[in-house]
Every structure is written in C-alpha cells, then in structure tokens.
C-alpha cells in the first residue's frame, strides 16, 4: 500500500467535500510537505494518463477528486437521462436521515447508515432535494446538509413539523431506517422507478 494509493483512497471517500492538506497529512501521519509532494505526483499521473477520467482540483490547500473537463458533456447527458432520475433506496434512506437530523455532515450520515454515502448525497443535491446549510467548525470544514424548499413541495409538506415525531424516529433508527414516508410518496410520483440495494448514485 503506497502513500499515493492511500491519498487516492481518502480523496475518493471524502467525495465532493474534498480534504485539507493538514488534515490529510494528519491521517497519513506524514509532514504536509511530504503529503503535498505525493499529492502532486498523483495529480500529474492523472493529468498525463489519457485512459483516466480523473483529476485532482486544488483550491488553496483543499483538494477534491473530480472528473476531467472533457467528460463534462457525457456526464451532463447522463444527468439528463431518465435512467439517472430514479432515486435508489440508498438515496431515499440518506434523504430521510438528512430530513430528520439536519443540518448534518456526510460523515455523520455515513456513521448512521454504516456505508459511504457521497454518491447518494451528490444525487440528492443534483435533484435539488438537499443543499448546503453551512460548514462544521474545525478541521476540514465539512459541509452541513439540509432539505430544500423543493423537497417540501416534492413530498407535499408545508413544514418539517408534518414529519413523524422525532423521538419516535430516533427510536426506530436504532433498528431500521425510517424511509416509508419518502419511499411511498416517491413511488407515487415515480411509479416506474426501481430501488436497488446498497449504495448507489
């Protein structure tokens, strides 16, 4: 397991939030200089590899794993296709957690679901069901997510008070994720949609 491969794995897991240089160095137990050196190697590797669609975007001392610009039209085509519009069970479960626990970070959602949820979050953001509600104070400045006005309209809610009792929700979370409200209403508006098991975008 090389240092470069460890960096690649971390960048993949943190998703669109990216990660700061100091936090990455801390996780790797390396100096910031050494970490940046290895990051640069990975960035140059992606840039020179015509068979890779990946790229590392550097903003200040923050790094995000992205796709290369030349794939933008292809990804836009996918985003607009009917196949991409259906929300998976994983996305609906993620949405229910955000609705009840907002504002909440991706890491907190991951801990509740027990799996990595960046794909579901990206899908929900693209569908305008959730949005950024601020940042966590501290290292990394993780994004906090919450539901949108479109979410309220989409599920026929006038306010979050119309959701089932939060204490009951927290009790149920210990056994099974409560997504029935969202699943039923989503199925009503998307009768041809199919949900799949596991984490899907």
Curated annotation (Swiss-Prot):
Keywords carried by this UniProt record: Cell cycle, Cell division, Chromosome partition, Cytoplasm
Location (main, coarse): cytoplasm
Subcellular location: Cytoplasm
Stored InterPro entries: ScpB_csome_segregation, WH-like_DNA-bd_sf, WH_DNA-bd_sf
Gene Ontology BP, a term: DNA replication
The keyword Membrane is assigned to this record: no
Gene Ontology cellular-component annotations: cytoplasm
General function of this protein: Participates in chromosomal partition during cell division. May act via the formation of a condensin-like complex containing Smc and ScpA that pull DNA away from mid-cell into both cell halves.
Entries under HAMAP family matching the protein: ScpB
Family under the similarity heading: Belongs to the ScpB family.
Subunit: Homodimer. Homodimerization may be required to stabilize the binding of ScpA to the Smc head domains. Component of a cohesin-like complex composed of ScpA, ScpB and the Smc homodimer, in which ScpA and ScpB bind to the head domain of Smc. The presence of the three proteins is required for the association of the complex with DNA.
Name listed for the protein in its UniProt record: Segregation and condensation protein B
Annotated source species: Enterococcus faecalis (strain ATCC 700802 / V583)
Lineage of the species this protein comes from: Bacteria, Bacillati, Bacillota, Bacilli, Lactobacillales
Gene: scpB
């Amino acid at each position: 397991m090389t240092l470069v491969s460890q960096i690649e794995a971390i960048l993949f897991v943190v998703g669109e939030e990216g990660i700061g240089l100091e936090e990455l160095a801390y996780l790797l137990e390396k100096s910031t200089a050494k970490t940046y050196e290895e990051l640069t190697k990975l960035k140059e590797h992606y840039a020179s590899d015509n068979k890779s669609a990946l790229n590392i975007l550097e903003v200040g001392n923050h790094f995000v794993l992205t796709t290369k610009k030349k794939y933008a039209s292809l990804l836009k085509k996918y985003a607009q296709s009917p196949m991409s519009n259906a929300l998976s069970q994983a996305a609906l479960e993620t949405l229910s957690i955000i609705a009840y626990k907002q504002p909440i970070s991706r890491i907190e959602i991951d801990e509740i679901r027990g799996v990595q949820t960046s794909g579901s979050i990206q899908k929900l953001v693209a569908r305008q069901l959730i949005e950024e509600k601020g940042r966590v104070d501290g290292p990394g400045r993780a994004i906090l997510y919450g539901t949108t006005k479109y979410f309220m309209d989409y599920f026929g809610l006038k306010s979050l008070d119309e959701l089932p009792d939060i204490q009951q929700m927290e009790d149920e979370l210990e056994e099974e994720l409560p997504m029935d409200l969202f699943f039923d209403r989503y199925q009503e508006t998307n009768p041809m949609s199919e949900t799949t098991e596991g984490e899907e975008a």
